[in-house]
Amino acid sequence: NMGVGSPDLAPDPSVITAMQLAMQDENAHQYQSYQGLPELRLGMVDFYKKHYDVDLNYNTEILPLMGSKEGIMHIALAFLNEGDQVLIPNPGYPTYSSVVKLVEAEPILYDLTAENNWEPDFEALEKLDLSRVKLMWISYPHMPTGAAGSLALFEKLVDFAKKYEILLVNDNPYSFVLNDKPISILQIDGAKDVALELNSLSKTYNMPGWRVGMVCGNATFIDAVLKVKSNMDSGMFYGIQKGAIAALKLEDSWFTQLDKVYATRRKLLFQLAEKLGCTFDTKAVGLFVWAKLPESISSSEKFIDEILYSKHIFITPGTVFGSNGEGYIRFSLCVQEEKIQEAISRFG
């Protein structure tokens, strides 16, 4: 299975030890604060300062989440009403559209293409009727394509959001996978006026099943999200918070060793992609290889089905992420080297 981006590697031992020791605390099994432990929020604030040079107030500008995915729903409930419109990338994470529909708002897809480096076409966006658009989803580093984005792009996006009074949300869980220059939209001057950012410990620290993420932004936006969240759960489990605190303290050597594993796997996946006649961007970042199928292939899904039934290998068809994913397939790096080599061998 080369489809799902669920890290198969273990967290650092210090993370597991911190959780184990937390079980001995007398309040470990009680309800926890909706805002999380102050120590966790401070750890997240320090993480943003160290890696992105972004200053955040730990009391008002950051909110721990049970995974950043729940933040997508919280944000929709906090800021959207029936009939509002939301700009959603095509291709992009399917949950953006699903959540918009759940709150009876309207998804408006905007095109991302290889010709434009998988970045928004601002000229095309400005031609749209934006009067009902309340929110815009972006995701850089981009999933599924691995486009890194840039501070210059973020500046354009912040200017666009200010001009049209749109709340901009950057979904940013892939900053630290095979990416030498992690960036945050909150690095841009004035971004806090119009932007929120979601982040996650899932891919960064191999903790997908722990469900730890965060949303960052100005106090007014965070308070609106908290009003929703406080009616959805009763706080994050204490032991998980303690483990997350330990993870956030890890040195940069953690990312270096992780990248060594992923770089080796990626090189093997490049070989597999070449066997399938695909082309790809070797400079893409993140947890996936986004590969373009040969021009002779008319359907990504049909191509994948044939491989699934004949070789017993699953690869994600690009169409899962939108119509602009047609002609592409996505490999996950969350597959052991031996299994990738086995997959390569099945093609002779």
Regions found by a protein language model. Give the residues of each.
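N-terminal small-domain helix-loop-helix segment of the aminotransferase-like
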Residues: 1-66, 74, 248-250
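PLP-dependent enzyme catalytic core of the Aspartate aminotransferase-like
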Residues: 46, 54, 126, 297, ...
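Conserved PLP-anchoring active-site segment centered on the Schiff-base-forming lysine
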Residues: 78-100
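A short helix->loop->beta-strand "cap" motif at the edges of active sites that frequently abuts
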Residues: 84, 105, 163-167, 191-193
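Helix C-cap/helix->beta junction micro-motif
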Residues: 103, 163-164, 276, 311
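Active-site phosphate-binding strand-loop segment of PLP-dependent enzymes
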Residues: 108, 112-183
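Conserved core segment of the aminotransferase class I/II
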Residues: 190-263, 267-271
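Conserved glycine-rich beta-strand-loop-beta hairpin in the small C-terminal domain of fold type I
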Residues: 245, 261-270, 280-292, 325
